[in-house]
Amino acid sequence: MKKILVSACLLGENVRYNAEVVEVSDSIKALSEKYEIVPVCPEVLGGLEVPREACEIQGLSGADAIDGRCAVLGNKGTDCTAAFVSGAQKSLELAREHDVEFAVLKERSPSCGSTTIYTGKFDGTKHPGEGVAAALLRRNGIKVISEEQL
């Protein structure tokens, strides 16, 4: 069976920044009938705890953080950039280890957002962009889609 990477929070795992568990959607359940699911939470892989500060990228996209052009900051001012980049690298290693077909990642997440992320102002505004892990996966040829595109 072919494998896909899926954000662990979309699978009902307790990994979200606020420790809220999200119910597994029917579209995610349907994927498990066609693919072997490889769960991933880049933020936890990078060493961040649950719960943790809400974080936002202080640049246009996750690629900026990967390339050292901006930081990923928590809402209390903590610089979480190294954890986000490390988690993205470990997510890429996991994707390669399992030879995944593609990744389904959580939209608007500073790690996993694939088309939209928060602006970095912590005021709820969003703009086009991708999270750190989504950017690194794409940079390495892995297709990334949002759960909202299923």
Q: Locations of the language-model features?
A:
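Divalent-metal-activated hydrolytic enzyme cores
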Residues: 14-17, 33, 45, 63-94, ...
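Short glycine-enriched, charge-decorated loop/helix-capping segments at active-site entrances
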Residues: 19-21, 118-124
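Short, surface-exposed acidic-centric catalytic microdomains
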Residues: 22-72
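Extreme N-terminal starter segment of soluble prokaryotic enzymes
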Residues: 1-4
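Short, well-ordered beta-to-alpha junction loops that form the rim of enzyme active sites
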Residues: 9, 106-109, 149
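Active-site loop/lid in soluble adenylation, ligation, and acyl-transfer enzymes
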Residues: 8-20
